[in-house]
């Protein structure tokens, strides 16, 4: 895996947030390590008066308590908004039966709307919490948790976020908990991705950053090539999530001057 100067990376993120978000930020806090890390860094950059944390549960579980631990340890303003009535109303009015993934996407997009409603009313920016591992594999909801004004962790792999979290004082129980998108009860990232973050990051770094051949990656890591192909398929299959909508080109149909 690549070697990162973590102390300088932390300073760079803090400077970035301070430069881009001087009016303040709104952060969705899930109780996971990514949102906790973003919130800690934003507070270091802007001061606690300019950071609003929104805790938006659909389920009442340990994640809510972990999210409260983050905001209370930092002393920032926060609000707990139960999205269940909103989501259930939307689903009811849609009038079709949704599977658990589709329902999870409705939850993520509901949270996005709430974040932006607060940010607009306060003239602030929404800070996203996606990391590079999620971004490259498409492990986020399009126009949901993937939507933000700035994403301080977007160029850091999940394993690097864990390291930064430890260095800036994110509570240990949050750093060590199993990552989950919180889209349904019992859901975990690694189960859904079909691979551990440690191995995923090793493959992604070689596949995307170093542009190594699949066979060489498998040989380097001592793993079946099918594992590498699985990650490659995740990256290729989610390309549409990483770009704005496109349409056909008409350049060749335009008459000359």
Swiss-Prot record:
Catalytic class of the enzyme: ligase
Pathway: Cofactor biosynthesis; NAD(+) biosynthesis; NAD(+) from deamido-NAD(+) (ammonia route): step 1/1
Cellular component aspect of the GO annotation: cytoplasm
Positions that bind ATP: 28-35, 129, 158, 180
Stretches of the chain forming a coiled coil according to its record: none
Catalytic reactions on record: deamido-NAD(+) + NH4(+) + ATP = AMP + diphosphate + NAD(+) + H(+)
Positions annotated to bind deamido-NAD(+): 109, 142, 149, 240-241
GO molecular function annotations of the record: ATP binding; glutaminase activity; metal ion binding; NAD+ synthase (glutamine-hydrolyzing) activity; NAD+ synthase activity
CDD domains attached to this UniProt entry: NAD_synthase
Keywords: ATP-binding, Ligase, Magnesium, Metal-binding, NAD, Nucleotide-binding
EC identifiers of the protein: 6.3.1.5
SUPFAM superfamilies listed in its UniProt record: Adenine nucleotide alpha hydrolases-like (SSF52402)
Its biological purpose: Catalyzes the ATP-dependent amidation of deamido-NAD to form NAD. Uses ammonia as a nitrogen source.
Subunit: Homodimer.
Family membership noted in the UniProt record: Belongs to the NAD synthetase family.
Protein name: NH(3)-dependent NAD(+) synthetase
Organism: Pyrococcus abyssi (strain GE5 / Orsay)
């Amino acid at each position: 895996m690549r070697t990162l100067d973590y102390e300088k990376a932390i300073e760079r993120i803090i400077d970035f947030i301070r430069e881009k978000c001087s009016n303040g930020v709104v952060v969705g806090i899930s109780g996971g390590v990514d949102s906790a890390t973003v919130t800690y860094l934003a507070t270091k950059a802007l001061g606690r008066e300019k950071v609003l944390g929104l805790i938006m549960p659909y389920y009442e579980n340990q994640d809510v308590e972990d999210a409260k631990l983050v905001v209370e340890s930092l002393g920032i303003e926060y609000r707990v908004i139960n999205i269940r009535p909103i989501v259930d109303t939307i689903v009811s009015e849609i009038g079709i039966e949704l599977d658990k993934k589709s329902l999870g996407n409705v939850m993520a997009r509901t949270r996005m709307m709430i974040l932006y409603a607060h940010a607009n009313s306060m003239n602030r920016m929404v800070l996203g919490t996606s990391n590079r591992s999620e971004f490259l594999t498409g492990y986020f909801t399009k126009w949901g948790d993937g939507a933000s004004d700035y994403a301080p962790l977007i160029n850091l792999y999940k394993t690097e976020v864990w390291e930064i979290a430890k260095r800036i004082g994110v509570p240990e129980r949050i750093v060590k908990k199993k990552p989950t998108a919180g889209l349904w009860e019992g859901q975990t990232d690694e189960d859904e991705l079909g691979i551990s973050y440690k191995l995923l990051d090793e493959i992604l770094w070689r596949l995307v950053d170093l542009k190594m051949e699949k066979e060489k990656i498998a040989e380097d890591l001592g793993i079946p090539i099918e594992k590498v192909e699985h990650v490659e398929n995740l990256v290729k299959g989610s390309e549409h999530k990483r770009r704005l909508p496109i349409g056909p080109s008409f350049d060749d149909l335009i008459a000359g001057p």
